[in-house]
Amino acid sequence: MKVGVLALQGAFREHQKVLAACGAESVQVRKPEQLEDISALVIPGGESTTIGKLLLEFNLFEPLVKLGQGGLPVFGTCAGMILLAREIAGSGQPRLGLMDISVERNAFGRQVESFEADLDIPVLGEEPFRAVFIRAPYIIEAGGGVEVLARFGEKIVMARQGRCLAAAFHPELTGDLRIHRYFLEKCVRAGQNCKG
């Protein structure tokens, strides 16, 4: 199994380190041909508008939509979650639309640059997950096929739909491998019919 990590912006190297610690091989993706041999894709954080433009510029946008619609497991963190969304509040920016979610960008206020919080994520066990939020989005609406995995207060900050996983925070910056392991075990290895 080889996991592609979109390497246009953001903490892609950190994602690769976590994947390696989970025993998964990874490859940086910057060109369409690099999508050919991957079993899954991680879309890191960064600036979602910029990443969307770069996906178009590097001819990655359409191949990613087709692969995602065809069942490629995709894990998006922060800006990656925004790109996975069907709808982005107040924005017509490019998005992959692979999850039936609507998101709000910079949802915790632009003045709140970053913060950390303990999240209860039952699918990961009883121990809270220390999440790092950096100008984070959140999910304002989730369709019927979307499983909400975590909230911060009332705000949805982690969700799964089929083989797609989205987190508003940055698990790659924590040293906690559980979310990446969950993605590999439940979305990648378990196959399309996995329900959790």
UniProtKB/Swiss-Prot annotation:
Protein name: Pyridoxal 5'-phosphate synthase subunit PdxT
Keyword Zinc part of the UniProt annotation: no
Active site: C78, H170, E172
UniProt function note: Catalyzes the hydrolysis of glutamine to glutamate and ammonia as part of the biosynthesis of pyridoxal 5'-phosphate. The resulting ammonia molecule is channeled to the active site of PdxS.
EC identifiers of the protein: 4.3.3.6, 3.5.1.2
InterPro entries, per database record: Class_I_gatase-like, PdxT/SNO, PdxT/SNO_CS
NCBIfam families named among the record's database cross-references: PLP_synth_Pdx2
Pfam family, one: SNO
Pathway: Cofactor biosynthesis; pyridoxal 5'-phosphate biosynthesis
Gene Ontology CC entries for this record: cytosol; glutaminase complex
Alphabetical keyword list: Glutamine amidotransferase, Hydrolase, Lyase, Pyridoxal phosphate
SUPFAM superfamilies per UniProt: Class I glutamine amidotransferase-like
Catalytic activity as recorded in UniProt: aldehydo-D-ribose 5-phosphate + D-glyceraldehyde 3-phosphate + L-glutamine = pyridoxal 5'-phosphate + L-glutamate + phosphate + 3 H2O + H(+); L-glutamine + H2O = L-glutamate + NH4(+)
Species lineage: Bacteria, Bacillati, Bacillota, Clostridia, Eubacteriales
Entry similarity comment: Belongs to the glutaminase PdxT/SNO family.
Subunit structure: In the presence of PdxS, forms a dodecamer of heterodimers. Only shows activity in the heterodimer.
Gene coding for it: pdxT
PROSITE patterns the UniProt entry points to: PDXT_SNO_1 (PS01236), PDXT_SNO_2 (PS51130)
Coiled coil: none
A GO MF label: pyridoxal 5'-phosphate synthase (glutamine hydrolysing) activity
Binding site for L-glutamine: G46, E47, S48, R105, I134, R135
